[in-house]
């Protein structure tokens, strides 16, 4: 299982109750999953090649994650490379990259807010000129609301987009029109 934090504990416990040998992979830290897993590796859960190497060495039958989007691409990659059941890399990208997800939804005829992807703040005011405020900026590949900022007017635009860029792993941010409503 990729991840060893509080979000993964119920799933690790369930796997162990069902007699599974559980290997937890996550960056080094004080994560409770390391204490209950049968074996641990301290590796970034986005490092696909390192995780593939571990998976091959261990001869795993299943790879999964729970409660974290950032690990999904690595799970899909390893499953594809090892011929295990999984969602596949293309589906994982559609699920975890907010820009790719929006493009896919738009192309499928699903209504989406106006959006753009940026990797810097150069000419940012021109780039959003056809969008209505408020806006939202967020890293395309983050989860847990990290780097998400509401932008109420053009005066906040550069600062908030920079903050989102600072939270982005690959320096990509999506800016989209804000939609009022409940978050699910």
Model-derived features: positions:
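A generic structural signal for residues located within well-ordered alpha-helices
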Residues: 7, 70, 96-97, 131
């Amino acid at each position: 299982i990729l991840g060893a934090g509080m979000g993964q504990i119920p799933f690790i416990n369930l796997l162990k109750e069902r007699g599974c040998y559980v290997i937890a992979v996550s960056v080094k830290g004080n994560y409770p999953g390391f204490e209950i897993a049968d074996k641990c590796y301290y590796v970034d859960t986005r490092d696909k090649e390192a995780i593939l190497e571990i998976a091959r060495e261990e001869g795993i039958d299943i790879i999964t994650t729970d409660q974290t989007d950032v690990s999904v691409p690595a799970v899909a990659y390893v499953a594809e490379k090892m011929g295990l059941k999984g969602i596949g890399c293309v589906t994982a990208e559609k699920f975890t990259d907010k820009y790719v997800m929006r493009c896919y939804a738009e192309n499928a005829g699903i209504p989406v807010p106006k959006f753009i992807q940026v990797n810097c703040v150069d000419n940012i005011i021109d780039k959003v000129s056809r969008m209505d405020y408020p806006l939202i900026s967020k890293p395309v590949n983050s989860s847990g609301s990290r780097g998400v900022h509401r932008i109420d007017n053009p005066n906040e635009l550069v600062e908030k987009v920079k903050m989102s860029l600072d939270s982005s792993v690959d320096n990509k941010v999506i800016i989209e029109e804000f939609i009022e409503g409940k978050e699910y």
